Amino acid sequence: MDLNLYLKQLETLVNIDSGSHNAAGVNKVADVIEGWYRDLGWHVINHDVGPEAGRLMEISNRPADHYDVMFVGHMDTVFPDGTAEKRPFSMDEENVYGPGVGDMKNGDTAMYHVALNADPKVLENLNICMLYNPDEEIGSRYSREKMDEIGRKADIIVVMESAGNKGTRHCFARKGSMGYELEFHGQAAHAGFMFSVENASAILEMGHYIVELMALASREEDTTVNVGLASGGTA
């Protein structure tokens, strides 16, 4: 594997803002990746999953109705527009940095290098697919139906997202996830008269809930809890 080429390609992807809701940015990443594979002579199918997300890419070494092996990655990140400019790709002696460098533009690039470095005999005998998801960070909200349809064509599926940084090599199962949106309503009042008029702080109540929710986390049961976004108040 050509590490210098890998890092150069990774830098290109990391320096493109591609938050899940930035369809244009995700498609810019897709354009770059698609070019890599077309230069190898691979077959590319672009699936439109709606205007709210970038495109889903089904890439294979030949057109096929069945895949022996499928590698899966996602092109979107959790970062807002402008992050790539504020902290672009960088390196030190041990690590690389930048938005999406570990989740999972490293894996997206590695998928290409699987194709680039595959034994020709393997490519001759196996149907291999590289599937690039545009909206994984928001639960594959727009691509899930098509992802499931394509996934059923494969005998083996390997997700190329990083499994961890503490010696983990492969992850065969972990855990599911659930998400909730909670809305709190209070009774508005002037702060200077809070002891003399009826009032109730929705923000204070939300704070109590946050503390209680975080207490549900358990190291022993590997139950993790995260309050990802909280806001409230008007003045």
What would you call each of these model-derived segments?
Residues 66-68, 125-127, 153-155:
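A general structural motif
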